[in-house]
């Protein structure tokens, strides 16, 4: 009975995955990105000279993928084995929002500087590492996972940063923002202050 249930689930998932692919939209039509990454290792490259289309490489399954008229690409991607690489082409287009959620033990490494008006990164129980972020608003959230992010020095004083944890650590530029210990001590929420005298944010 249990074996039949598993087979039915796998068949249902396989049918749901068929027919979906990455958007064949040129970069200047995509202004917001909303990704849910699941089940394995991912890396995101944000590079010049990659053309106008998004590229996804590796052993993956796209459970859902949609593109709306307001320029938002939403996708739900599973990593089946190995590392799955998503290349986001860089050109003069500016993203309004980038929202990436890592769930079900997914790990993510963002190699290049990621830029948008607003960036939201979250992880459930995996590890998320970035080499550089540039945004007006940055939100970092973890459940029991680990987030290690870096912010470009030129953006430090102009960025509103919020962080939240249910246990795991969140660090930014080597500074611990939030972490809860086993006894419940520590800091669960972080929101940097805006200094009216210097008209800038403090990390």
Indicate residue ranges for each PLM-predicted region.
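Short, small-residue-biased leader/transition segments that mark boundaries at the very start
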Residues: 1-2
């Amino acid at each position: 009975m249990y074996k039949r249930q598993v087979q039915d689930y796998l068949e249902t998932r396989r049918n749901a995955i068929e027919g979906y692919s990455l958007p064949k939209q040129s970069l200047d039509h995509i202004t917001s990105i909303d990704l849910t990454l699941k089940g394995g290792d991912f890396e995101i490259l944000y590079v010049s000279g990659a053309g106008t289309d998004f590229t996804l490489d590796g052993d993956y399954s796209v459970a859902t993928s949609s593109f709306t008229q307001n320029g938002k690409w939403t996708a739900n991607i599973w990593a089946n084995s190995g590392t799955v690489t998503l290349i986001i082409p860089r050109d003069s287009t500016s993203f309004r929002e980038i929202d990436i959620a890592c769930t079900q033990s997914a790990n993510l490494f963002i190699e290049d500087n990621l830029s948008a008006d607003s960036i939201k990164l979250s992880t459930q129980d995996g590890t998320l590492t970035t080499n550089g972020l540039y945004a007006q608003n940055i939100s970092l959230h973890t459940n029991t996972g680990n987030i290690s992010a870096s912010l470009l020095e030129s953006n430090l004083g102009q960025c509103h940063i919020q962080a939240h944890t249910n246990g795991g650590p969140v660090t930014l530029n080597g500074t611990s923002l939030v972490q809860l210990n086993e006894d419940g001590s520590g800091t669960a929420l972080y929101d940097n202050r805006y200094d009216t005298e210097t008209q800038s944010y403090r990390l």
